């Protein structure tokens, strides 16, 4: 009976240890708490600057916002910042982002402006220059098996 009780107590302690939030995990989350987030950058109803543009990301960082954004791959495996799966709401293009090559995609104006969809790397540089302490929440959109190796490389980077 004592052995059974010891085993139960040991299992309970292990379970508690496994589900108890670690201090390190909480420390990693601290930059994300108590902050407002600019979804797709800081832009107005008139899309000036347009969402997902470098000026919108710079404005969010300069004004102390965290940023939530979406990235996905073009057909030639360039990682771009773009929320929608299709091009037609924010650009004059038609079809899916993953079917467009970077040269075609990057030439499309965002919301009729002079701004164009950015590469993820360019967005990172822009935000780092504006405010390097800006927390980012990045959603990786990928519905295609061919992007798996690129996503694995991205996660390792």
Which residues does each predicted region cover?
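Phosphate-group recognition and catalysis centered on beta-loop-alpha active-site segments
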Residues: 2-157
């Amino acid at each position: 009976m004592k052995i059974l009780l010891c085993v139960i107590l040991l299992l309970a302690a292990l379970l508690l240890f496994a589900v108890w939030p670690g201090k390190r995990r909480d420390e990693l989350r601290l930059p994300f708490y108590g902050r407002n987030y600019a979804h797709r950058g800081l832009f107005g109803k008139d899309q000036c600057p347009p969402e997902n543009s470098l000026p919108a990301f710079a404005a969010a960082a300069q004004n102390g916002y965290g940023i939530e954004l979406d990235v996905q791959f073009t057909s030639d495996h360039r990682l771009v910042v773009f929320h929608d799966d299709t091009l037609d709401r924010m650009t004059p293009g038609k079809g899916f982002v993953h079917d467009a090559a970077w040269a075609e995609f990057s030439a499309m104006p965002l919301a009729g402006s002079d701004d164009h969809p950015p590469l993820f790397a360019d967005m990172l540089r822009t935000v780092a220059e504006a405010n390097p302490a800006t927390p980012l929440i990045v959603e990786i959109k990928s519905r295609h098996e061919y992007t798996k190796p690129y996503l694995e490389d991205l996660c390792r980077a």
